[in-house]
Each structure stands twice: as C-alpha cells, then as structure tokens.
Amino acid sequence: MSDQIEHGLLATVLRDAAAGRFPPANGEVTVLPAPSPRDSGVIGFTAHAVVFTDADPAWVRARLPDDDPSRPLSPAFLQALGTHTHREAHIIDMLCVAPPRSGQPGIVLRPEPDIAHPRIARAMRYRDDVRAWRTDGGLVLIGRGVASRWEVAIEVDPGCRGHGLGRALASAARHLVPDEEPVWAQIAPANAASVRAFLAAGFQPAGAEALLTHSELGV
C-alpha cells in the first residue's frame, strides 16, 4: 500500500493527474478519505488505484491483496465496499481529462434553463454548480463532481448523430469551464461513439472510475 499520498486529498491527486503527474505505477493502492458525503469510489490509474471512502482504511487493505492490482475495480471488491458502506456500485467508466481552451466554442450555444430535462436533472444529483447549454440537436453541461473537479456530459439527439456534433459539444466544454481548470469526462467504455467523440475533442484517457452512490443522500 502506498503512503506517498496517503495523507493527501483526492483533489490533489486529480489535479496532478490532469497535469500528467500520475501516482506511481507500482501496483499499490492508496486509501483516501471521501472528499464529501456524496463522493465515494475507486479510481484506477496505470498500476495504481485510489480508493476514496469513509470506510476504515484497515478494512479496505484487508480485502486487497498486494499481488492483484486489478482487484480494486473488480466486481467482488466493489460489491463488498458498497455493502460495507451502505452504497451501491455502478458501472466502471473510462475517465478522461482535457485542459481548458480560451475563446469561444466552435458552435453556437444558448443557455438551457429547463432543469427538469432528464440529463440536467440527473447531473444535479451527482454534481454541484451545474450549467447547461443547448445547440440545435444537442446539449452540453458542466458541473463540479468528484472532489469538486469540473465534469462534462453531452447528449446528441438521435436524428443528429453521426455528423460530428458529439465531438463539437465535447470540445465546447473545454471553452466553458471557468478559472482555466481542466475538465473531466466519465464515459461508458461500451459507448464507442462517445469515446471517439471525446478523444477527437482532445480528451486523454487518465484511468477508470467506479462511483458508489448512497440512496439516503439522494445520489
């Protein structure tokens, strides 16, 4: 188990990763406190995993053998952690990040005021400070998610898919984040079209992530 960032914060780990400074690829696991009551889960980097949870670190370590670096993102461990913390593990997402861009987005956007929109309503369960914009055929939103990082989600209307709009929306998010901060994307690996769109928009793979949600917290 790693003690190099044991007493650090998840926000610091993410900020360093966005700048290309990843945890050491040594096959170890770092256990950090959950950054908020909402946020709990596992992030897997290259040969290094970060578990952020309110569970006792000793409990976590006892269930992660040193000779299995893939164990933290295994269904068995995620289920055990979820049961222990009264949370539910969901899908394992591909985690990508991109630096911000100056100037205006390359597509015309207008604020989307309808917070009842399903994509926006869902985002507000998992993120703070959610902001959304619409263009013809699509929607892009940003919000502060895990450890207050800026996260992006996009939606392309079915009739407008296959024409590069997803890439344009993902690229627009890089212009929309304030304070010149990086923007993160959680992408279902099976959604190949979304993966291609974000990669084409300049997002780079950083790792994989599984979040554990708590029904009592509304997430």
Model-predicted segments: where are they?
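N-terminal charged segments
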Residues: 1-90, 106, 110-127
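Conserved beta-strand-loop-alpha-helix junction that forms the acyl-donor binding cleft
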Residues: 185-195, 199, 204, 211-217
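Conserved GNAT acetyl-CoA-binding A-motif
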Residues: 49-52, 148, 177-189, 209
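Conserved beta-hairpin
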Residues: 125-140
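Catalytic phosphate/metal-binding cores of nucleic-acid and nucleotide-processing enzymes, i.e., regions
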Residues: 112-113, 147, 210-212
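C-terminal "cap" of GNAT-fold acetyltransferases
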Residues: 94-102, 211-219
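A conserved beta-strand-loop-helix scaffold within acyl/acetyltransferase catalytic domains
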Residues: 137-150, 154-157
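Conserved acetyl-CoA-binding loop-helix of GNAT-fold acetyltransferases
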Residues: 152, 156, 162-176, 194-200
